[in-house]
C-alpha cells in the first residue's frame, strides 16, 4: 500500500490499452458470477479467484493450500495465489473487446472533445459511432473530402464505382483511424494561423479547438486513447454480491452492466469467427457500444438501461456523482468509530470545560482504554477476562473508568454544524441517566436547546488529537465568535433574568438608606431579612479595598444596592466597582457622584438622599456581554471562563429566588388606545376623500394608509412602554434581553398592527385588537397568512442557507495563511460605509484589528499615531477617529500578493483569539462559515411595497446569493460609463426615461424604466461607474466600467448592507476573503508571445508569471481583463481537479482534467481530505510537521564534570 502522507501530487490522464492490460490480473471471459450451489466464484467469471485473488485469507480456491505458511504460492490445481483476501479490493481485470468502442465521456460531453479534435459535429460523430453512416477515412480517387459522411446507399454507389480504391468505415473503428492520423503539431500550426484571421463564431470555435489540441499535445495523451480496445474491470469487492436471508442475492448494478458487455462481446467474437453477414455484425457492434456506454455513464445517451422495477442501473459515473457518490459520501464524509449520540439535558453545576457523559456510554466509548488499565492493574488476567468484566459491569470497572476519562477530552457535536463552534471539546464527568449533560453557556454557540435536541460524542484517540482538543477546541478556550470577535458565550434567558433582577433597585424597598461598615455586614443583614436585594444602601468605601477608588473617595460612603454588592463579588478585583451599566464605569472608574460625604447628609440621612435620586438601570444582556468582553481583554481566557461560571451560578440562583412568572393580570391594556385609533381612522378618511376626488393616485393612497397605521402602532407601543410598571414580569423579561421584545408586548396588550397577504403585499386593514382582548374572526384569518408563510419560509431558508455555506466553503477552502508578510505595495482605502445618511458600518470598526498601510499623524499635534505595517488596536483605532481622521489605507486581503491564500499582515488579527493570526490558520473556511452561519437569520422575503415592480428590492438571503453568484440583480440600476455632466433628463418612448450624459469627447444617453427613481439632477457632474437611478448595480458590468478596486469595495458594501440591516455583524475581512476568490481569474485578450490561449480563463498569478517570463526574454506580453466569477463557477474553475470534481459536475470536471493530464498539487483542504492526508493547515502544515530536532547542548553530566575541572 502507498503511504498516504508521503506523496506530493496526483495526476490524472487517459489510459492507453497497454496501461489497462498492465493493471489487469487476467481477462474475464465469462459473464458468470457465483455458482449458486457451491457459492464459489465461477472460473474466468466476474468474481474469478484466479484473477482477483482468494475469497478467504491465506486459502486457495480448492483448499489444497491453507494457512499463512504457503504465502505467495500459486496453487497448481486451481491457479489461485495464496494471499490475503484484501487483494480483491485492489486487483483489476479486463475484457479484450472484439471491436473498438468509443468512450462516452469524450464523445458526448459538452463540448464534445472528439468533435473538436476531428472538427466534426457531435451529430455526425453519433451517426458514425452508432452505425448509421459511413465516414470517409481515405478518399482515394473518389474526389470526396476526408471525414465526409456517406449513407448506406451512397457508400454502395461509390463502392461499385471504385472497388477497393477508397476506405470508409462505420463505428468507433472509423473514428479511431481518423484520430490516429491526427498530427497535433500540424493542427496547432493551422489553428494558430486561423486565430490571426478568424472572427466571430469561427474565432470562438478555433479557440476551443486550440485548447483541446494544446491539452493533448502537452499532456502526452494520444487522441486514439479516447477509443477503447480493452475495457478495465474494477475489483470485485468494490461491486460486491451478497447473499440475503432466504437465499437470494443482492448485487451491485455494475455487475449487471459488466455482464451485458461480456455477453455482447462474446457473441460478437462468435459472429466474427463464423463470418456472419455484415449487417448482423454491425448490429452486434452497435449493441456492444451501447453496453459500454451504459457501463460508463448510463442514461447519458438515449433511454437508460433499467433493472428490476424499471429502476435505472447505477453506472460508474453515478458512483462518483452527487451527494450519494463516492466523493461526497465516502471520501469527504465518513462515519467514525468511537462515537455515540444521545439527548442533551442541561448541566447547571458543570464547569465551563466540562460535560456530563452517561456512564454506560462512557464505558462503551472508552472500552479499550479501560481494558488496558484493568490488565495493567492486574484486576483482570488478560484482555478476554477484562472484556467480560466490562460486559458484566463489575464494581471495579467504574473506578478504572473514572481514572481513564480524567484528562481525556471528548468532542461534542450538534448537527447542523454551521460554524466551527458546532464542535467543541469538553472534559467528561460521569453522570447517571442516559442523557448527555451540556453546560448552559455553550448552548448559544451550538444553537442548542433542551427540548429534545441530540448531540454526538467523539473520542480523540491519539495523543496529538487529545492535545489539539485540549489546547484548541476546549469550550473554555472558545469564548469569542470568529465572525465578529465578540463573546459568543453570553448568558441567556434565566441567567440574564437572574442578574437583571439582582441589580434592580426599588423605591419602596425595606430599610432604604441603611449604612453599613462593610460588605459582610450587608450580606448578614440580607440573610436575616433586614434588607432586600433591591434595597439602596450605603457602605463605607474603604471597606472595598478597591484599587480604582481614590483616597478622597475612600473617606466617603458608596451609595449602591444590596444586589449590586453581591454581583460585584464575581467581578475581578482590579475592576472598578460596577454601579451603573455604562462603558465609563466598566472600563475606567465608578462615577464620583455615587460617593457621598456623610457630613453633607441632612436629617433624613441617606434615605432622604435616595428619595431625590433617580433609580439606576439594572444590568441587561448587552451589558453583561460588555463585561465579559472587557474581562477577556484584560485577563486570560481561564479567568474569563471562571467568571462566566460564577455569573451563570448567580443568574440561576437569583432567577429561582425571584420566581418571576407571567399571568393574565400582568398584561395591562392601554387605557387611551381607542382614542389613538380614532385619531388615525380620521386621517385615513381624509386620504380616502383625497383619492375619491382624484387628487392622489391609488399607489399614493395605499402607501399613505400603510404609513398611518404603522405610525398608530408605533404610538401605542411607545405609550405602552411608558405606562408599564418597571417590575412587571413581562417588561422585565423583555427589558433584560432574556426573552421577547417591545413588539411582542405591543401585540399582547396594544394592537397587532398591519399584516402581509400571501403575495407579500401588506394588507391595508390593520388588526386593531390585541391578543389580550382577542381577535375577531376576520382578524384571525388575516394573521394566519403570515404564520403560514413564516413556517414555509423557515423550511426553505434552512436548505438554501446550507447550500450557500457549502458553496462558500468550496470556493475558499484553500485560502490559508501561508506567510508572514507578502510585501505588497498596495492598500485598501477604508471609510464609513453609509447608505444615504444611514450608517451601515462605522470607520472605527473597519480599521480595528487590521494592519495600517500608511503613517497616520495627528492633524493638530503632528504626533505619529501609527506607522505602516503596525496592528491597529482598539486604543489606536479610537485615537485615529478622535483625531478626526475619516479614512485611511489599510492592508487587506484584496491587495495581498500571497500566491495561495493570504499573509498574516493583510489578514489582520484572528477574531477568535484576539491575537495576531498565525501561519496555517484556515481563514477561508472560517470566512465561509462566518458568512454562511447567520444565513438562517436572514429573511427570505422580497419586500413588496404596494406591488410596484420598480421599487421591489431583493433583501436577505436571496440578495446574498445574488451578490456571491455575481448574477444580474433584480431592480438593476443604470450606471454611466463615461465621466461628464448630466445634460438632460427627458421622457422617451414606451414610458421610459432618458438620461443624457455629456463627456469631454462623447455624449451618451441611457434609458431607465418609467417607474425607476432617478437620483441625479441636470447639471450634476458624474464619475465613471456612478449610479444614475436607484437599485443594485450589475457587478460584472461595473467591473469593466469602474475597475477592480471599485468593484471589490462595492461587493463588500452590499454584503455588509444586507447583514447589518438584519442586525448581524460580520467582520469585513471575511467578506474580503470571499470576494478575492471571485476575482482570482483573468480572461486573456491577446496572447502576445506567451503560451497562453486567447479567450481562456487563467489564474491571475499564472498570467503574471507568463508575462514575467516574456519580459525576461524581451517578448510581447499577453493582455487580459479581470473577470468576476460567481462562487459556483469559481469553485469549478479552481486549479485542483479533485476539489472541483467533488463539488459539482463531476464527470465534466474529470473529463477535462484527464484530457489536459492535470496534476493536483494538493494545496487545498478538500484534496487532502479526499486522499486521506492530514490537511495542510494548522498543525498539519508542512512547516510544523517537518520539524527537525538537533541536540545543541551537551548532556548535563558532561557539563558538570567540566565545571569541576575549571574550578
UniProtKB/Swiss-Prot annotation:
Binds 1 Mg(2+) ion per subunit. Binds 2 Zn(2+) ions per subunit. It comes from Staphylococcus aureus (strain NCTC 8325 / PS 47). InterPro entries: DNA-dir_RpoC_beta_prime (IPR045867), DNA-dir_RpoC_beta_prime_bact (IPR012754), RNA_pol_asu (IPR000722), RNA_pol_N (IPR006592), RNA_pol_Rpb1_1 (IPR007080), RNA_pol_Rpb1_3 (IPR007066), RNA_pol_Rpb1_3_sf (IPR042102), RNA_pol_Rpb1_4 (IPR007083). Keywords: DNA-directed RNA polymerase, Magnesium, Metal-binding, Nucleotidyltransferase, Transcription, Transferase, Zinc. Its cofactor is Mg(2+); Zn(2+). One of its GO terms (molecular function) is DNA binding. The lineage of its organism: Bacteria, Bacillati, Bacillota, Bacilli, Bacillales. The RNAP catalytic core consists of 2 alpha, 1 beta, 1 beta' and 1 omega subunit. When a sigma factor is associated with the core the holoenzyme is formed, which can initiate transcription. Zn(2+) 2 binds at residues 822, 896, 903, 906. It is an enzyme of class 2 (transferase). Mg(2+) binds at residues 449, 451, 453. The gene is rpoC. This is DNA-directed RNA polymerase subunit beta'. The keyword Membrane does not apply. It catalyses: RNA(n) + a ribonucleoside 5'-triphosphate = RNA(n+1) + diphosphate. SMART domains: RPOLA_N. Pfam families: RNA_pol_Rpb1_1, RNA_pol_Rpb1_2, RNA_pol_Rpb1_3, RNA_pol_Rpb1_4, RNA_pol_Rpb1_5.
